[in-house]
């Protein structure tokens, strides 16, 4: 294994989380992003899988592996195996998907599936509780936890796709997301910025139907003196923060910019901020979460 790591092994994502949180959707998104995906491979075979990938002449450079409650008695070995591989220098990231108990119960009710850990009681809440306990050690070592409570399958797929769309560039991956406070805060955001202090195009009849990506709306929003000052100050702040986050070893940063409905002001400002960051050499993933919502 050491020989493989020294040669430069593949990028590995361990996808885990509670049942019903969206792992199947996330795995499909990873496959679309170019990962070789393996569902329900016993974690003890991970080292062998990495070893075999070293004989593919670079054809397998990104691997995604689902590790969850189906591992059974092997699940307890997962944190140890992952830690050992990391210590050998492998590029392994653990992505944990979670959701509120209420949303998980609702999802199981909609699909009428039995929870895999329901046990003799057969109830979904009992299964959820047992699974949370079984996965606690994996969640503790996760590089990122994504709460999918408020995300639909399309939003989750977009999030994962943009999160892993490229493996090159700066060590710190930056995502700028616009959103509407009406639809709740992005649960995965590291920095949240409120731009509701700006004049709202919603109240201008000729601008109301158009999103912040429309040049007319963008000109109106970005032409405001306060919008210009906001961009200058936020750019200065990020110019201070990003090098320090990199030095700390932080891999990902999500900056969320919100307005009332997530259609006009936040969209225009998020696009402008992303453009500034990219102009400074920082690759950025831009996501307008609520722009199509009413």
Curated annotation (Swiss-Prot):
Pfam families: PapZ_C, RapZ-like_N
Keyword annotations: ATP-binding, GTP-binding, Nucleotide-binding
Domain of life according to the entry: Bacteria
Residues annotated to bind GTP: 68-71
Positions with a binding annotation for ATP: 17-24
HAMAP family noted in UniProt: RapZ_like
Keyword rRNA-binding in record: no
Family, per entry: Belongs to the RapZ-like family.
Physiological role: Displays ATPase and GTPase activities.
UniProt name for this protein: Nucleotide-binding protein Anae109_0152
CDD domains per record: ABC_ATPase
GO MF entry, a single one: ATP binding
InterPro entries listed in its UniProt record: P-loop_NTPase, RapZ-like, RapZ-like_N, RapZ_C
């Amino acid at each position: 294994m050491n020989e493989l790591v020294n040669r430069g092994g593949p990028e590995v994502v361990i996808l885990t989380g509670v049942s019903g949180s969206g792992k199947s959707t996330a795995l499909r998104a990873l496959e679309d992003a170019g990962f070789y995906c393996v569902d329900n491979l016993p974690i003890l075979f991970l080292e062998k899988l990495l070893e075999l990938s070293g004989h593919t002449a670079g054809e397998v450079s990104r691997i995604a592996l689902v590790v969850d409650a189906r591992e059974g008695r092997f699940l307890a070995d997962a944190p140890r195996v992952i830690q050992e591989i990391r210590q050998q220098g492998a590029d392994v990231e653990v992505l944990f998907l979670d959701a509120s108990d209420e949303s998980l119960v609702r999802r199981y009710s909609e699909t009428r599936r039995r929870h895999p850990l329901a046990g003799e009681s057969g109830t979904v809440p009992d299964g959820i509780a047992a699974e949370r306990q079984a996965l606690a050690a994996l969640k503790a070592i996760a590089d990122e936890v994504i709460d999918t409570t408020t995300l639909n399958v399309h939003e989750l797929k977009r999030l994962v796709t943009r999160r892993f769309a490229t493996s090159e560039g700066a060590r710190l991956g930056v995502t700028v997301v616009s959103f509407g406070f009406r639809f709740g805060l992005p649960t995965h955001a590291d920095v949240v910025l409120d731009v509701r202090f700006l004049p709202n195009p919603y109240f201008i009849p000729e601008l109301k139907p158009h999103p912040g990506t429309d040049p007319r709306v963008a000109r109106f929003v970005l032409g405001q003196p306060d919008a210009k000052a906001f961009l200058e100050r936020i750019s200065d702040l990020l110019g201070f923060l990003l090098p320090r986050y990199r030095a700390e070893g932080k891999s990902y940063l999500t900056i969320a910019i919100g307005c009332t409905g997530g259609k006009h002001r936040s969209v225009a400002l998020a696009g402008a901020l992303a453009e500034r960051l990219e102009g400074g050499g920082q690759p950025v993933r831009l996501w307008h979460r609520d722009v199509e919502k009413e």
